[in-house]
Amino acid sequence: MKLGLIGKNIQSSQAPDIHKRLGNLFKIPVNYQIFDLKENDKNYFSDQVFRLKDRGFTGVNITFPFKEEVLKYADVINESSLMIKSSNTLIFKTDIIAENTDYTGFLRSYEFHFGKIKPKKTLVLGGGGVGRSITFALGSLEVEHIYLYETDKVKGNILIQDLELFKINCTLIDYNQLKKIISEVHGIVNCTPLGHYDFPGCPLGEFMPSNDHWIFDAVYTPAKTTLLKKGEKVGAKIISGIDLFIFQALDAFLLFSTQRIDKNEISKHIQFLREYYFKVLFK
């Protein structure tokens, strides 16, 4: 099974490792390659997608900054990708099929930590591809209210309008409101690249969370970001992007696999994968 990852600044990605591990667990040979595009060249990106399909790839994962752009090249867009207007997984059959396992992966990550408890007021930092997936996932979890901090006001307002179509309440805030909103919310979710090895920093700037917060960071390289370190320092519940990484990869592998794998069967390996990746990455 030939798979790949297309994105920018992705040399530290663990995607090849986890898909090969899953292949070994289910006795499916996996060849997984990284295609690190150095520029946001949309034409080059589209050429790469069609080239990999022609080369017999089963599918590819898509990451920053192409999760929204990729929908232009899909023949079939699944329901969640259509709703979110973003995709992180392409399946190559006769058609190119767009799926979104960031959405399902966040749902599973949240439920892993909180069960059936509905999210209270939540601050989401960043409204790009993964931000769109997570805000819609929070909506599916019946979040009380979302506060979106997105510096691109046009992008932020488009997301809010899209959420309103599904009766998901969201307010766009600016930096001047950030400190006040942090004090009012229960959850803080980072969907920006800030904190990644190639984008150092903290999306909260100089502001600090408190021990009343739960904090999730979609960045997992490094696994313990500046944001999570801030949360750990004050005693907040911190949730590493490792969980999203694992759950979205499990869902993607099920979609890629040409043999039938029972979801319950793959779920048996969650604890093993969490223990391994937290040991390797969470330092």
Q: Residue ranges of each PLM-predicted region?
A:
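Short helix-loop-beta connector
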Residues: 115-121, 210-211
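Conserved S-adenosyl-L-methionine
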Residues: 140-145, 234-236
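Rossmann-like adenosine-cofactor binding region
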Residues: 169-239
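Glycine-rich adenosine-cofactor-binding loop
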Residues: 7, 100, 110, 118-143, ...
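Helix N-cap at the beta1-alpha1 junction of Rossmann-like dinucleotide-binding domains, i.e.
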Residues: 10-12, 152-154, 222
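Phosphate/diphosphate ligand-binding glycine-rich loop within oxidoreductases
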Residues: 1-114, 230
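Short glycine-rich anion-binding loops that position phosphate/pyrophosphate groups of nucleotides
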Residues: 58, 62-67, 129-130, 193-196, ...
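Adenosine-phosphate binding glycine-rich loop
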Residues: 218-283
